[in-house]
Amino acid sequence: MQNIYLISEKEAKKLLKELADKIERYNHAYYIENNHLVSDAEYDQLFNTNLKLEQKFPHLILENSPSKKVGAKIANKFAKVTHQAPMLSLSNVFDEQDVKDFVDRIKNFLRLNEFAPIFCEPKIDGLSFSAIYKNGLLTIGATRGDGYIGEDMTANIKTIKNFPHKINNAPEFLEVRGEIYIEKQDFFNLNKEQEEQGRDKFANPRNAAAGSLRQLDSSVTAKRPLKYFVYSGGATEQNIASSQNELLKKLKEFGFRVNEISKLADSEEEIFAFYEYLKTNRENLSYEIDGVVYKLNDFALQNRMGFIARAPRFATAHKFPAIVGQTKLLSITVQVGRTGTLTPVAELEPIEIGGVTVSRATLHNFQEIIRKDVRIRDYVFLQRAGDVIPQIIGVDIGKRSTDATTFNTPLFCPSCNSKLHYIPEDIIIRCDNVLNCPAQNYERIRHFVSKNAMDIEGLGRKQVEFLIDKGLISNPLDIFLLKEKNEASLTKLENMDGWGRKSVENLFKNIEESRNVSLPRFIYALGIRHIGEQNAKLLAREFESYNNFISQIELLSKNDSNIYQKLNNLEGIGDKILVDIINFFDVKENIELIKKLGEVLNIEDYKETKEHSSLTGKIVVFTGSLPTTSRVEAKAMAEKLGAKVAVSVSSNTDLVIAGVDAGSKLKKAKELGIKIIDEEEWLTIVNNV
């Protein structure tokens, strides 16, 4: 990444936009899908780069800046819960100087002459929750969500062993906040059970805890070994205590589990000593921690310090450095993904890092192998920092043997033997044999049945692989014909290895239930490159119904310029994504598959809660800087009133709202004779509606 102190304003503007998009994607994966896309260290580096750029160019801060947000927007499976007080994130520090700066900021802000006691406690690597008690009874349990609105998990939280359903001598209203987690040994046992049952293994204990809690069926959660600690009283903590250490004593009296490993530090030296103690002993703990949390102990002083957009000023998290180990690289295998992208994976001599046995590590892409000069039979340095797959960060050249061999970048697909396509701008190699590559087909079906797509439980990796190998399915449509095919077959599925009557009955039941699917989930399930859940929702909002969707994409496949322009105007669908959409529907087999799926599924029309107004169905464009309203707020207003917000002006545009320094869009609107108004007129329309 460029030196931010030498970066120009133009470059900074572009980079801030890229960082906001990237961090939003990682946040959604982490908080909603319970999935790490990047290491904690890489995420922190991106976030800190964003902060430093904003400090240098404060006038470039975006409305959707990561520094203003916590978590990610919640999914639609669970009821929404508005938090009494925001569940904010914590800022991070990484070394002693950062900690000293944190302490100095407290002193300077409060104008203190001496050290203010700091409460230190382990940072549990789990899932944050809030629990509300009214008259001593647990009434609401919720996840953090986006920090302001979480998901109602009351029934599931009640299944956690020893979680109080009723507390004595409690105030009329009480909130507690904490972390739900799974211990290391329980995680190992759970993954062993998942593997034996042919289900996907969890990537790490946090992922397992989050996935276990976010179950629609609370009986599934009840079977998972979830534990919890509380560390905060949320909106009510200052009603029952005057400091953090006093609060934890009180919560313990109420019957909650609090972490006994903590320290009230009276000096910087005591802070550093506690940090070193935990860093040294973390592997001896039964649960995962990834740092130490420091909080100003006195609540009155906390009140004076207050908050910034996404975090309190009075607290921070001192992250541990990534755990590094060394082992031998035995070979490099190549995986082919759903969209044909090839990824190199290092096969390693097993090594234990941070209590987890590691035998594989990502090499990201083939350029990385060349850049790091990684060779087969090298001794490599391995880093694990909460990653789904640990990373190779370097090679011990001093240990390189004469039989270490260079890895040759493949020219042909390891699955179908097709010639590969190198895409320099994306630093990727891709197999373009979309229809006949077995690996791509397998990954496409896996994506189709996944939780956020068709959500067909009972079709894990092993089951999909088995059904493909036996010739029982070869595409998503076959899944819905499987029961009929099984009934007509002499060799029943329930009599095959790994199956039984009950598991087959459950599978067919789950397949049947999945036939009712929303349009956004259906579009996402198709596996179009670069169409994640958010973009699938954008397309569903545009097409509104399955019938309209299929008719429009058929026109798009015939190069209809109106459909192209309509999609190109959608905010969030750029040129690159539009090319991927066109490429997908250029394949006639894809359109035929979608038509056949439409015959066996009940695809629900897209419905979005919006007010009916004179703007309903109108296409509006904002251009220039609005004097009193942010672009994000203006867009939200328009969409709430039923309008569609486009990013460019065309003959389909109904209204242009022009602000200060409006440029080419305003000019084009005048040329096309489109109605143009200023912000004042726009707000009048909104207020009248």
UniProtKB/Swiss-Prot annotation:
Name of encoding gene: ligA
Domain BRCT: 610-689
Matches recorded under InterPro entries: BRCT_dom, BRCT_dom_sf, DisA/LigA_HHH, DNA_ligase, DNA_ligase_AS, DNA_ligase_CS, DNAligase_adenylation, DNAligase_N
Organism: Rickettsia canadensis (strain McKiel)
Residue numbers binding NAD(+): D40, A41, E42, Y43, D44, S89, L90, E121, R144, E179, K295, K319
Database matches in Gene3D superfamilies: 5' to 3' exonuclease, C-terminal subdomain, 6.20.10.30, BRCT domain, DNA ligase/mRNA capping enzyme, Helix hairpin bin, Nucleic acid-binding proteins
EC number(s) on file: 6.5.1.2
Record's protein name: DNA ligase
Annotated family: Belongs to the NAD-dependent DNA ligase family. LigA subfamily.
Domain of life: Bacteria
PANTHER family: CHROMOSOME TRANSMISSION FIDELITY FACTOR 18, DNA LIGASE
CC cofactor: Mg(2+); Mn(2+)
UniProt cross-references to PROSITE patterns, sorted A to Z: BRCT, DNA_LIGASE_N1, DNA_LIGASE_N2
Pfam families per UniProt: BRCT (PF00533), DNA_ligase_aden (PF01653), DNA_ligase_OB (PF03120), DNA_ligase_ZBD (PF03119), HHH_2 (PF12826)
Keywords: DNA damage, DNA repair, DNA replication, Ligase, Magnesium, Manganese, Metal-binding, NAD, Zinc
Keyword Glycoprotein: no
